[in-house]
Structures are given as C-alpha cells and as structure tokens.
Amino acid sequence: MATAGGGSGADPGSRGLLRLLSFCVLLAGLCRGNSVERKIYIPLNKTAPCVRLLNATHQIGCQSSISGDTGVIHVVEKEEDLQWVLTDGPNPPYMVLLESKHFTRDLMEKLKGRTSRIAGLAVSLTKPSPASGFSPSVQCPNDGFGVYSNSYGPEFAHCREIQWNSLGNGLAYEDFSFPIFLLEDENETKVIKQCYQDHNLSQNGSAPTFPLCAMQLFSHMHAVISTATCMRRSSIQSTFSINPEIVCDPLSDYNVWSMLKPINTTGTLKPDDRVVVAATRLDSRSFFWNVAPGAESAVASFVTQLAAAEALQKAPDVTTLPRNVMFVFFQGETFDYIGSSRMVYDMEKGKFPVQLENVDSFVELGQVALRTSLELWMHTDPVSQKNESVRNQVEDLLATLEKSGAGVPAVILRRPNQSQPLPPSSLQRFLRARNISGVVLADHSGAFHNKYYQSIYDTAENINVSYPEWLSPEEDLNFVTDTAKALADVATVLGRALYELAGGTNFSDTVQADPQTVTRLLYGFLIKANNSWFQSILRQDLRSYLGDGPLQHYIAVSSPTNTTYVVQYALANLTGTVVNLTREQCQDPSKVPSENKDLYEYSWVQGPLHSNETDRLPRCVRSTARLARALSPAFELSQWSSTEYSTWTESRWKDIRARIFLIASKELELITLTVGFGILIFSLIVTYCINAKADVLFIAPREPGAVSY
C-alpha cells in the first residue's frame, strides 16, 4: 500500500512567509520613523547660518562639527547672564540665545575664549535697530585691493587718513569654531524661549532638573585654511576622481552693463571713441549667509543710477551725442572689488567691447541715501591729480557736476578737502590701471553716515523708507516716499551731468528722473520683490526669483543671482524699446532682417496686466542691457594666493539646519542605552532559538496519502 510522503524540515513557504512578515515589520518601522522624529524634534525653518569664507591667507566665518553641535539652551538677556554659560552652569555645553542688540564684539570675544562650554549661538532678530549702530564689517573695507599702497599714495594706504567705516567691529571677518545662526522668525524665537522657560530656568539659583530644552545646529563646512588649499584639493579631485568632491567655489556672478547708444559687442571700439562711465555696485553682505539687505550700501545707489539711465535715454538728441555713456552695475565689490577688477582685466586683455583707452571720465555713485542738509559730496583722487592734465580733466568734471546740480535746489554739491583720498569705490580699481578723471558721489564727506554698513540692519528703515499702514501692497508700490523723491533728485543731477559729459548742450533741463520709477524700485528691492511691476518686466521663467520679501544682495556662488537678473531687466525695460516681434522672433532675432543681435539684447517679458487683471500682455523689449562675467581674474589665472585680485571663495556644505528638542540626563541616557542593548541581545537570542528549532515549530501539514485499490 502506498504511503504519503512527508518532509521532516520546515516548509520553504513558511520560511518565506516569516521573511515577508519581518520585512513588513521593518518597513512599518521605517515609515513610522519620520513620525517619531517629528514628535521629538521641532525644526527651525526660518534661519540663516554663518558660513565659512576663505581668501588667499585665511578663513573666516563659522561651522559646526560634522554631526552637528548640540547644547542646552540658555537665554542671555543681559551681560550678567553670561556667567551661567561661562562658569556656573552645571550642564555644558550651552547653546546661547541672545537678542541681536547683544551681538557685540566684546560678548563674542568672551564666548570665543570658552569654546569648551559653548556649543553654538542663536541670534534673534529684534527691532528697532541699535541706536548706536552696528557694523560687522572692518573699519577699512577692501583694504589692500584699492589704489592706495606703499607705492601709490602711501599716506592714504590702509585708511591712515580716514577710517571710512568707523563703527566696524570686524566680526564678519573673524573665524569661529562653533555654529552661529540667525533666527529670522519671531514666532520660532518665542517657541524657543517658552521651551527654555518651561525646562531650563533655574529656581533660586539651583540647577534646573532634566529633561532640559536643547538646540542642535548643523553647519559643517568642507573647506579649511585658505582658498589656495581648498582650490588645490578641488583641482586634485577633479583631475583624478570620477565623482569629484568640490570643497569650495569662487564668489562670482555677473556685472550688468548697457550703452546709451548701441555698439557692436562682437568687436572693440576704436581708440578715438570716447565713453563716459557711470558706475555703482550691486552687492552687500552681513554676518549671515544670504542676508544682505544693503539698503544704503548698495540699493539706494543702483536704484538712483537706474532712474538716471531712464531719464538720460529720453533726451531728444541722445543718438547724436559726441560721446557714448556706459552704465555699469558691478557685482562682488564687497569682496575686494570682484566685478570692477574683472572688467578692468577684460578691458586690458581686449575681451570687452570698451577698452580702458576709450574711458573719457568716470562717475560713480557711492552711498547716497543719507544726505544731511541736502549735501552730496564729490570725492576725487589727489594722487592722480598731481598730473596737470588729469587735474584739469577732474576740474572740468566737477564743474560740470556743479552746473548740473545748480538746476536742482534739493541737491547741494560739495567738494571735500582736496588732499582727502577716495572712499572705497570701484573707481580705485580703474585708477590702478590708468590715470583717468573720476569722481565718487556720496552722502558723506568723511566717515560713512551709514551706521549699519554691511549688516542685517541696513534695511528700508535705515534709509527712512516707510508707508502708511492703511495702504494695500499695490498702493505701497506706487506710493512716492520722501526717500524716493530725494533719490530722484540725485538721479536728475547725475543724468544731466552725464548728458553734458557726453557732449550734450541743448536739452540738459529736460533730463528729469521719475520719482515713480524710484519708488517702485525701492519697494521691489527693499520691501516685496513679488509685485506687479517686477512681474511685468521679467521673463516668465524668472518669476520664481521674486519672493514675498525683499531681495538679498549677497554675490554667492550660483549665478546670476536674483538681484542681477532683476537689475538687468529693470535696466532693459527702463532704457529699451518695445518692438513688434513675435515670441519666436524675439527669442531668435537673427531671422528678422531689420534686427541685429550684435547691437541689441532681446527679451520676451511678461508685460503689464490685461484689463481683465488676470492675463498679461507679453512683449519683446530691445535694449543694450547685458551681463558680463564677474569672476575674479585670480581664478582665471589659477593664482589662488594672489594679492592683486580678489581670492574669496565660499565653502561647500552638506546640511544646514537647526532644531530644538528635550534632552535627558546622562544617567537616563545610559540606562536607556543599556536597556535597549539588553533588548537587542534578548531579541537575537530568541531569534536564534526560533531559527534553530524551526523544523519543530514550523511543521508542514501532511498531505493525504494516495489510496490503493
């Protein structure tokens, strides 16, 4: 009689089912991991880190350890509160939270000296701005990279004559071994302080009990020592690795430039072609990465120049002027004149349509929004004027400016002491290459009026830009502020002076800057970039560059930046003309016989809103507004230790974030670890035993045997 066959081992199907169940349990655990993390940690989403920057000689900025730095939060509201952090507190390291008004050099020096007890620093942005001023920049900006040196005006080198930024404390140029973050959201700051009060506040001087509120900051930087070191490492990686790990990038972007009369950009001007240069800077910075409002240090001046360019372009005889005018907006001037030094380099090498020998005169706008008694100061270089020819040219330049200012009562042009040097300015880089007649227009005769130079406080409030509370955002956009009127007056003086410097004689009085243009530009750059006017002047694919807040003017390493694009398109729309081309023709004008891409740039912009206020009327704008590379020549030449050109780089990083959570005592952490380890061992033993006895525990049911007849 036949019998049914049966196996003594575990059924493979049962083992497969066991593996499937184990996988499902593991997957469920992973899926629940994020949920558990959200219950433990509160992420801080509106923060700005201090990052590491490097140059030819050293590194500045901040960083955390590779796994982030964690510390018990302690709020410092007055100087005495530091004692707990530096000596008395029993649970170091501490994460210090302080209001921005306490963010001073003296306090930072104390923290820097006790790094074993400091995990990091969180700075809450508070208002109003410190009345005494705050500037983390140095007192002599761009020292060593301007025109003055031991061989050229040694008495003016290193700001021996004038400390231009007298309030500068140099914090932004220090190196800190712990992370420092700016808290930009007031609500997040309140959450942190509430957590501190609930868990960390000591009673009667005694130590608080666990759990304690802690903060963790991640900002580990990949680059170290200097630009030469990090660029060399990146170069080696790029040469020998399939997937190179770049550790730093040069600070770079694009200069924005345009010509009053179009020129062929595929060649260079003839030697006898004369060009008047009107220049200003686009960038600023602060202690924190990509927080650079730059209202007085940058925005007011480039807004004024945009308005002057618009006014000059409307002059009736602009196409017949004997000399051309070039408007230039330099990027990276904060970091040792990146933009201007690159343009001078390209001019010298014949890589730019305008050559140095074509420059007839140079008019630069410095800081111009904080004038006192209506005064605008005309700064010149005393050293180059030792040459009689240059002195006569400068005298003619100043006389032209004074004549132009005479028709604008709201602007009083003044000459500082003739032996006074130039303030930090792009003109200095041109003077290093060639003696030219130039002037820098500024609201200060000596040290800066700007108490918040290159700081988080150089905002709209610093230049008195404010709006009535009852107005809507659209009404704010078109509300002409007193600051806009004042800057429009300066733009009118500049426009008329440029008209006369270009050889114009008949229509100087018709050159008039529009306060409406100035107020729209100020609102867009300092209050809300995502507004109807900025939307109308940009390409559709650039809409994402417009946020609901102000634009930031840090040069960065990814380019072009938001500011660069918006300034380019603002310049194009203010000085260009709308041409009757289709979208396809605008994007490829070479197919249109009457158009010339060597002379003009063509942009298909969104245009103004249709009457139904939902659709836009796109159009093609033809202008001479272009971009030119603003990368220091040091990186073109691989001279990473250069003292001639800027060598600033920005370190790369993997993770930038901040979060708070409750931290247990060391004893409880040890107990938890021990129990967890015990459970792990027990689980492994149980798993081993089950696996060893699987043939007994998981016996497959016998199949019914075959029946014999």
UniProtKB/Swiss-Prot annotation:
Superkingdom, natural source: Eukaryota
PTM entry text: N-glycosylated.
Intervals, Cytoplasmic compartment: 691-709
Principal localisation: membrane
Signal peptide interval: 1-33
Keyword Isomerase: no
GO molecular function, one term: aspartic endopeptidase activity, intramembrane cleaving
Annotated keywords: Cytoplasmic vesicle, Disease variant, Disulfide bond, Glycoprotein, Membrane, Notch signaling pathway, Signal, Transmembrane, Transmembrane helix
Localisation: Membrane; Cytoplasmic vesicle membrane; Melanosome
SUPFAM superfamilies (alphabetical): Zn-dependent exopeptidases
Cited InterPro entries: Ncstrn_small, Nicastrin
Disulfide feature: 50-62, 140-159, 195-213, 230-248, 586-620
Glycosylation sites: 45, 55, 187, 200, 204, 264, 387, 417, 435, 464, 506, 530, 562, 573, 580, 612
Extracellular topological segments: 34-669
Membrane topology term: Single-pass type I membrane protein
TM regions (residue ranges): 670-690
Gene Ontology terms: cellular component: azurophil granule membrane; early endosome; endoplasmic reticulum; endoplasmic reticulum membrane; endosome membrane; extracellular exosome; focal adhesion; gamma-secretase complex
Pfam family of the protein (one): Ncstrn_small
Assembly and oligomerization: Component of the gamma-secretase complex. The functional gamma-secretase complex is composed of at least four polypeptides: a presenilin homodimer (PSEN1 or PSEN2), nicastrin (NCSTN), APH1 (APH1A or APH1B) and PSENEN/PEN2. Binds to proteolytic processed C-terminal fragments C83 and C99 of the amyloid precursor protein (APP). Interacts with PSEN1 and PSEN2.
Function, as annotated: Essential subunit of the gamma-secretase complex, an endoprotease complex that catalyzes the intramembrane cleavage of integral membrane proteins such as Notch receptors and APP (amyloid-beta precursor protein). The gamma-secretase complex plays a role in Notch and Wnt signaling cascades and regulation of downstream processes via its role in processing key regulatory proteins, and by regulating cytosolic CTNNB1 levels.
Associated disorder: Acne inversa, familial, 1: A chronic relapsing inflammatory disease of the hair follicles characterized by recurrent draining sinuses, painful skin abscesses, and disfiguring scars. Manifestations typically appear after puberty.
Family named by the database record: Belongs to the nicastrin family.
Listed name of the protein: Nicastrin
